[in-house]
Amino acid sequence: MSYINKPGKTSAWRVMTVRQQVSAVLAYGKIETTLKKAKNTQKRLDKLITLAKVDNFNNRRQVKKWLLNTNLFDVDQLMDHLFSKVAPKYEKTPGGYSRVLKLGPRRGDATEMAILQLTDAKYK
């Protein structure tokens, strides 16, 4: 029964979805999505914030590969926002920069929905 958990999308689609959602969370602070996508995006988001805690050329290059333009920021502005405003909040936090809050099933297809948001560093 290994066919049950396969989402039925190509790997390029999954990578692009994660890139879009990571950029949206960094720009807006939170997003509403399905539970499975939120958990998948949370892994990459926490890794990018960990990289952004040390500001050097290599980390900026690696982070830039995962960011996309949003309505508020282009890629360079979003990267500067991450390195100058988001990452310093979590400087002394060893991990757990984001959280997933379950919302319940979506009306229509009963898919489990969730909110992916950045945690505030002062509320441990």
From Swiss-Prot:
The keyword Ribosomal protein applies. It holds the Pfam family Ribosomal_L17. Keywords: Ribonucleoprotein, Ribosomal protein. The keyword Ribosomal protein applies. It comes from the Bacteria. SUPFAM superfamilies: Prokaryotic ribosomal protein L17 (SSF64263). GO terms for cellular component: cytosolic large ribosomal subunit. One of its GO terms (biological process) is translation. One of its GO terms (molecular function) is structural constituent of ribosome. Gene3D superfamilies: Ribosomal protein L17. Coiled coil: none annotated. Belongs to the bacterial ribosomal protein bL17 family. Part of the 50S ribosomal subunit. Contacts protein L32. This is Large ribosomal subunit protein bL17. The gene is rplQ.
